[in-house]
From Swiss-Prot:
The active site is at residues 68, 133. InterPro entries: ArgE/DapE_CS (IPR001261), Bact_exopeptidase_dim_dom (IPR036264), DapE_proteobac (IPR005941), Peptidase_M20 (IPR002933), Peptidase_M20_dimer (IPR011650), Peptidase_M20A (IPR050072). It catalyses: N-succinyl-(2S,6S)-2,6-diaminopimelate + H2O = (2S,6S)-2,6-diaminopimelate + succinate. It comes from the Bacteria. It is an enzyme of class 3 (hydrolase). Its cofactor is Zn(2+); Co(2+). This is Succinyl-diaminopimelate desuccinylase. Homodimer. One of its GO terms (molecular function) is succinyl-diaminopimelate desuccinylase activity.
């Protein structure tokens, strides 16, 4: 059994449902310490984090990832227990197999092998690992990055081991991510009897035109690196608990996924202009869960693409598709951030899995990238 597969199995066996680490980080820390890494455990609240490094020079390249996973859902729908790593037809099944315990296993084994072969290597290799990526992400990578900045530790390059590939390992890497902003909107009307609408003000009826305008608005055209900004309602609630009552309020929740084309303030102002145009009485609360970032095709991305070409014989596609990741926190330091990991088709799904052959290739890609960088 390969070292990467063996480590992945150990990690899958730990039911690390966010924010519980379930001992995964102890396994990783012990392995890294055994090859000379210095490690710091950085707990914040109930979240486990660690920071590890080997070397004392620049450039500083870090691997970043998370040990927490989403709940398995209905376990009767799994063909094997979600926290029992199971090999079948060349694949290994288990919660976290794709997102992202395989990435963690491959990064750690690649770093171990590199340090063993190059004990006096140039540069510094580091790890940021958290158990708070699938949850609120308030006490995880963000707090570790704050800690590193307080210590004046300058990061140059970062590989996030998220499942970035689409159909084949290495066919895509992320060189940026869109931002995410939520809005909670309350439309205020006047409650009344449903038989006497002239004595009430129905917030549901009042909202229709404004909601249609918001849904149809073209916020931007996107650009060569980012798709157009997306606006989606995901929850609408109204009602007074009785069939003969016009409700006093309607509550709606919506989300923006946006490129660096806009600031959050610009999007907020545009929403409020539309609501004001339709003369709505409203209250709105905003929550910016992540800012967009774009690292572009820098030195790290160039070497990662070279490593993928050498090992997988693919011309990888750099893109910014998908949701958010902890890369957004690390990008605030000014370092180049890319995401490179296994195929993402089964992430968060029942019977989550990864091709076993991809584990060795992914380990080799990380190893080769280290060779090229330092």
């Amino acid at each position: 059994m390969s070292e990467t597969l063996n480590l992945l199995k150990q990690l899958i066996e730990r039911p690390s449902i966010t924010p519980n680490d379930a001992g995964c980080q102890t396994i990783l820390i012990d392995r890294l310490k055994s090859v000379g890494f210095q490690c710091e455990h950085l707990p914040f609240g109930e979240v486990h984090n660690f920071w590890a490094w080997h070397g004392h020079q620049s450039p500083f390249i870090i691997f970043a990832g998370h040990t927490d996973v989403v709940p398995p859902g209905d376990e009767t729908q799994w063909h094997s227990p979600p926290f029992t790593p199971t090999e079948k037809n060349g694949y290994i099944y288990g919660r976290g197999a794709a997102d992202m315990k395989s990435g963690l296993a491959a990064m750690v084994v690649a770093a171990e092998n590199f340090v063993k072969q190059n004990p006096d290597h140039n540069g510094t290799i580091g790890f940021i690992v958290t158990s708070d990526e699938e949850g609120p992400a308030e006490n995880g990578t963000q707090k570790v990055v704050d800690y590193l900045q307080q210590k004046n530790i300058k990061l140059d390059y970062c590989i996030v081991g998220e499942a970035s590939s689409n159909e084949k390992l290495g066919d895509a890497i992320k060189i940026g991510r869109r931002g995410s902003m939520h809005g909670e909107l309350t439309i205020i009307g006047k409650q009344g009897h449903i038989a006497y609408p002239h004595l009430a003000d129905n917030p549901i009826h009042r909202s229709f035109q404004a909601f249609e305008a918001l849904a149809k608005t073209k916020w931007d055209e996107g650009n060569e690196h980012f798709t157009p900004t997306s606006f989606q309602f995901y929850n609408v609630e109204a009602g007074a608990g009785a069939a003969n009552v016009i409700p006093a309020t309607l509550k709606a929740k919506f989300n923006f996924r946006f490129a660096p084309i806009h600031t959050t303030q610009q999007l907020q102002q545009k929403v409020e202009r539309i609501l004001n145009y339709y003369q709505l009485n409203y209250d709105i609360q905003w929550n910016v869960s992540s800012q967009p970032f774009f690292s572009g095709n820098g030195r790290l991305a160039t070497f990662v693409r070279q490593a993928i070409q050498e090992i997988c014989h693919l011309n990888t596609e750099p893109n910014t598709y998908g949701g958010t990741s902890d890369g957004r926190f690390i990008a605030t330091t000014g370092c180049e951030v890319i995401e490179l990991g296994p195929v993402n088709k089964t992430a968060h799904h029942v019977n989550e899995n990864i091709c076993i052959a991809d584990l060795e290739k992914l380990t080799d890609i990380y190893f080769r990238t280290l060779q090229l960088l330092i």
